[in-house]
């Protein structure tokens, strides 16, 4: 419009591109140091660069990976502050190892699945957006484990995401595995 709106401050953006902030939905977070910090001031610079590129929110915990409990990570980010908003997915692999399943080719026991589901439910309650799986990296996961671990998302109204089991000729079957999980639990994929 050529009419200047009434406002406390008007910014002349003529000839500029104005858009909402971008979301980086696939970030891998850095580990928490022994002093309880994630990023030094120098390391925080990457988030300043992201902001200059227009990214205002970054999502970590992708591919089933977390460097620590993702809800604890969010608490540290809230405490220390970053130039962009950070959201987290609860990475299945971290919770699987935390429950005692270290063999990526082997199945999880019923008690390990129950432990994962309980801990992931807590992470969802504490602010995680959903659960991520790195099915390709944990080939021992089966449909029973997928649904058991994803089940807390149903109660919390959260989503699942994954690096699927395979690609190329097997990509459709791999995608269907994840979609079937969402369909069984009535949760977004």
Predicted regions and their residues:
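Divalent-metal coordination cores built from histidine and acidic residues
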Residues: 16-18, 22-132, 153, 157
């Amino acid at each position: 419009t050529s009419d200047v709106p009434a406002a406390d401050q008007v910014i002349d953006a003529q000839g500029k591109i104005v858009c909402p902030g971008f979301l980086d939905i696939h970030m891998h977070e850095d580990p928490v140091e022994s002093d309880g910090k994630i990023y030094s001031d120098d390391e925080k610079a990457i988030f300043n660069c992201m902001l200059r590129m227009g990214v205002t929110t970054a999502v970590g915990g992708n591919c089933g990976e977390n460097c620590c409990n993702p809800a604890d990570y969010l608490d540290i980010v809230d405490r220390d502050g970053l130039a962009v908003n950070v959201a987290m997915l609860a990475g299945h692999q971290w919770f699987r190892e935390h429950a005692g399943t270290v063999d990526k080719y082997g199945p999880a026991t019923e008690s390990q699945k129950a432990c994962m589901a309980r801990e992931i439910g807590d992470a969802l309650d504490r602010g995680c957006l959903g659960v991520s799986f790195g099915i390709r990296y944990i080939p021992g996961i089966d449909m029973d484990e997928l649904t058991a671990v994803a089940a807390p998302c149903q109660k919390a109204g959260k989503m699942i995401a994954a690096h699927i089991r395979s690609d190329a000729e097997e990509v459709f079957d791999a995608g269907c595995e994840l979609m079937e999980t969402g369909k069984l639990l009535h949760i977004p994929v």
